Amino acid sequence: YIPLHTDKKNKLISLMVYFPDLKKINNSDNWGTCFFKFKDKNQKIDLWDSKFMNEEVSSKFLEHMEKFYQSPFTANKLIGFLKTNNSFHKIEKILEKNALRKSININYYIQ
């Protein structure tokens, strides 16, 4: 589980390659990265205390957001996105006991 957040200011791009262990996973439908946007396009991010939120703040924040995409957690799938002030994303809680979410993350930072 990774709560709703945007990435650090100096991160330019994130790339992820997923490696699900299909022998051990019953259902990986909710394992991919979820991406969110504001319901109101005029909403300002500076109204919120933190860009990395605990579960309580994240829950309140999500009242103003809507999920517009969740990447499929499929073998050898590459996804990527550019960091913006509004590039909110999270990983849902995995309810399967002893599950392992394997991926390679490649992040490019600027100074």
Task: For every predicted segment, state its role.
Residues Y1-I110:
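Catalytic core of non-heme Fe(II) oxygenases with the double-stranded beta-helix
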